Amino acid sequence: IPPRQDAANAPFLLLLNGDKLVPLNLSWAILLANFMDRLEPFAGLEISESDWRAMAASAVAETRKTYPFTPKAQLAGDLELMLTSLVAIARGQEPAVEVGALSLGDYAAEMTAPHRMDLMLSAMRRSGAWHCNQKCLHCYAAGQTLGETPELTTDQWKSLLEKLRRANIPQVTFTGGEPTLRPDLPELVEAAQWFVTRLNTNGRLLTPELC
């Protein structure tokens, strides 16, 4: 996530697994973005060692267009070090490089957009009737002002997801109501592959096939 253009000394921000904030300098942010662009077509697929090497080499070549005087070997080493460190951070281990502490509150003033957007896929009420597959004694979503707002169509949600992506909002939460009541939920999750995606659900309709 890039900082505001007038925040010259602010780092880029990587949101890792939705709960870890990792600051990146400009060169590493460009290198990682180029690698992620090449990784995206493999979403949900097994990546062979040769594919991995090809993606890394392509990301390095693309980054050299910005840093033409930086040796390929140095960029390749930086990419390997960065990815190894990110895996360690994701696993709660000590990374190979020093990573400064960063809180969302401290970084908020440098951001160009929110770090998360909650999307109410399913309304709490339809035509005045309760629209959920449970009737809990307490529901945090019940009685809210917009609880009966008409639901967007699949195409409208996809269009919104694209707008959120262009705005550099890295995380979306599918919520409701009960989002699993929508038959297009898998399609919307697939459309949200670019994001860190969360699902707020009571779990009643979750099956191994749906998961």
Go through the PLM ranges and name each one.
Residues 1, 7, 37-41:
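Terminal accessory carbohydrate-recognition/targeting modules of carbohydrate-active enzymes
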Residues 1-2, 79:
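Eukaryotic partner-binding/assembly regions in large regulatory complexes
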Residues 3-30:
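Short alpha-helical segments that sit at the start of domains
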Residues 5-6, 14, 44, 71, ...:
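A generic alpha-helix propensity feature with a strong bias for hydrophobic helices
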Residues 20, 24-119:
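Long, charge-rich, low-complexity alpha-helical segments
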Residues 67, 77-81, 85, 95-210:
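Conserved alpha-helical substructure of the radical SAM core
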